[in-house]
Amino acid sequence: MARIGGVNVPVNKRVVVALTYIYGIGPSLASKICEGCGIGEDVLVSSLSDEDVVKIRNFIRSGCVVEADLRKEVAMNIKFLMDIGCYRGLRHRKKLPVRGQRTHTNARTRKGGTRLAVAVKKG
């Protein structure tokens, strides 16, 4: 396994696919990284030289927010919305869908499972 961006990427896959294992890098950004480093998209990770891996690491380090930094940034954005008390922040705080989805019949994942009432025998 090659270590790029703090993540072990699989060796037996193409570079474009392997880069998508890094949080924050999707298919389009992965192809831009390959193009910027001068590496073909159909090259396997196992056939990359050490210089190519260093090029990819430096490209990601210089121009991309990935992994822990990106997770922290997203969490801080959500916390900011909750702190200012805007509608989206209130929806996050109540653990309801944020982007206008209906909640009467759907949104089970976001709201949590249904609660079952337990019958108590009178005795």
Curated annotation (Swiss-Prot):
Of the GO CC terms on this record, one is: small ribosomal subunit
Which controlled-vocabulary keywords does the entry list? Ribonucleoprotein, Ribosomal protein, RNA-binding, rRNA-binding, tRNA-binding
Q: Does the keyword Cytoplasm apply?
A: no
One example of a Gene Ontology biological process annotation: translation
What Pfam families would the database entry show?
Ribosomal_S13
Q: Which GO terms describe its molecular function?
A: rRNA binding; structural constituent of ribosome; tRNA binding
Describe its function: Located at the top of the head of the 30S subunit, it contacts several helices of the 16S rRNA. In the 70S ribosome it contacts the 23S rRNA (bridge B1a) and protein L5 of the 50S subunit (bridge B1b), connecting the 2 subunits; these bridges are implicated in subunit movement. Contacts the tRNAs in the A and P-sites.
How is the subunit organization of this protein annotated in UniProt?
Part of the 30S ribosomal subunit. Forms a loose heterodimer with protein S19. Forms two bridges to the 50S subunit in the 70S ribosome.
Q: Which family does it belong to?
A: Belongs to the universal ribosomal protein uS13 family.
**Classification via NCBIfam families:** uS13_bact
Q: What is this protein called?
A: Small ribosomal subunit protein uS13
Species this chain originates from: Anaplasma marginale (strain Florida)
- What's the gene? rpsM
